């Protein structure tokens, strides 16, 4: 098992230490052990979770929804985990539809300034 400090976890995930500490306060991450000095230690699963949470957040999923999923995972509550995953999948599907619609709109945009001026009322 790799043991990560907060700073090493942040470095390996490509985020700041402040983000890791914020996620700890929100319950998105939990240390698996503590040093004698009281510092949290994290494992590979924590690194994987941090990378997932960050990717989901960057995709537009709120930290509240991610915290609900993490709480369900930490409690080993299969029903709640499944429910939270379903919510996230619905969000992803809606986001895909919105992006597809945006792509259609972008394709219809005039590319030359003269075309744009002619299309204005």
Swiss-Prot record:
Listed SUPFAM superfamilies: Putative DNA-binding domain
SMART domains noted in UniProt: HTH_MERR (SM00422)
Record domain HTH merR-type: where: 3-72
PROSITE patterns: HTH_MERR_2
GO biological process, one term: negative regulation of DNA-templated transcription
UniProt keywords, alphabetically: DNA-binding, Mercuric resistance, Plasmid, Transcription, Transcription regulation
DNA-binding feature ranges: 6-25
Superkingdom classification of source: Bacteria
GO molecular function annotations of the record: DNA binding; DNA-binding transcription factor activity
PANTHER family (UniProt xref): HTH MERR-TYPE DOMAIN-CONTAINING PROTEIN, REDOX-CYCLING DRUG-SENSING TRANSCRIPTIONAL ACTIVATOR SOXR
Stated name of the protein: HTH-type transcriptional regulator MerD
